[in-house]
């Protein structure tokens, strides 16, 4: 209950971060930067890798320079064929401070 109250009292920032799923494992950060640049200025790209093996997990986070550009990228690129796979592109969820195992 207390945690919910803290979350509800926080100011919500415009979300400029995008979740990108179903990525081919050979995708590089420059590949994604080039792809997402068609929707606006890309601030950062982070391809998620397995902690133990260092291998890509097939997902990434891309941060655009504005919320408008993030929404544009989502509408332009969701379900787009990229290197033989259909991407899942959506707004990244805001972290609540939890971390995986």
Label each residue range with its predicted role.
Residues 1-38, 43-57, 63-101:
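Intrinsically disordered, low-complexity RNA-binding regions enriched in Gly/Arg/Ser/Tyr
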């Amino acid at each position: 209950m207390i945690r919910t109250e803290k979350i509800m009292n926080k100011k919500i920032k415009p979300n400029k971060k995008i979740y990108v799923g179903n990525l081919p494992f050979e995708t590089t950060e420059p590949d994604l930067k080039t792809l997402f640049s068609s929707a606006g200025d890309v601030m950062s790209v982070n391809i998620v890798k397995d902690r133990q093996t260092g291998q890509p997990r097939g997902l990434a986070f891309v941060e655009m320079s504005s919320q408008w550009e993030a929404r544009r990228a989502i509408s332009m690129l969701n379900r787009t064929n990229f290197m033989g796979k259909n991407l899942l592109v959506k707004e990244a969820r805001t972290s609540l401070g939890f971390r995986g195992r």
